[in-house]
């Protein structure tokens, strides 16, 4: 009885984990696809290339290593696909290359925003985005090549263990963890820390008096009106929101995976499934964190959604109940502007039942 209860509990936990993993997979595909469309159709974004690169990396990961985690890995995966040595090595290479490409891409995006905010008037000091992203992919390729130096994978009858934590890097695993997680974390922390410091200084700076502003009188009422509030608001609160979310999301998703890479192989294998899918959740969180928190992206997404959805049928205004204005309101196409009170046609003497409201009497020549 106890064994059956334990089996049922493990099956329920595996099913819930599989459902959550599938939700993360769908969210990564849909979110990054929608954000990539918005970025490509919005020419005003200054860091559009970094955002598009991050979306492409997330889509590649969601289309390659995440399905392998659902099909080939043990719970929360299905564990029904048995990969041979060559496909398993390819899966290790993709995992060891795409994860650093994602973390280094996030760090490059943070540094680009730091230069745009802190040094907006010095565009010559910014390296070209193509050069930065080329360096990111070169480093990711070298880190992925380290996975080919590990122990060979097991033959197909054994369970598929094709991740980086399953002996894919061998003695190079600590070096891979430092370059793939510690270095991007330090770069991201420095970039968003600088952004927060600059924003907080701007919030603490007193506003400049407007030109032509009237001087306050020295009366008691004027002194009471300019007293500070009893509960002063902490300056820089809004400025701390975006850096805190970016750094917190990076630490929550990637810190467990990096610590597992530095742990012994036995403990890393025990926590492999949990830390792997926590890291994979970053692919689904990036569109909301780096896309929807930007006002230009939200505005562009709203414009695209309004163009895609059919427009609502406009109703007639209550001021346009004149028969001729009502006939025009019913006959015009739905996309036309609504007839307002200033646009309603004037009443004719025939429809008004005699003289028009603007009738002022006979001309002066007839009175003489």
Swiss-Prot record:
Tissue specificity is: Expressed in brain; detected in the basal forebrain, frontal cortex, caudate, putamen, thalamus and hippocampus.
Q: Which species is this record about?
A: Homo sapiens (Human)
Q: Name one GO cellular component term.
A: endosome
Which PANTHER family does the entry link to? G PROTEIN-COUPLED RECEPTOR (PTHR22752), G-PROTEIN COUPLED RECEPTOR 62 (PTHR22752:SF11)
Could you say which protein family the record assigns here?
Answer: Belongs to the G-protein coupled receptor 1 family.
Descriptive protein name: G-protein coupled receptor 62
From the UniProt record, give one GO term of the biological process aspect: ligand-independent adenylate cyclase-activating G protein-coupled receptor signaling pathway
Start and end residues of each stretch annotated as Disordered: 332-368
Q: Which Pfam families does UniProt cross-reference here?
A: 7tm_1
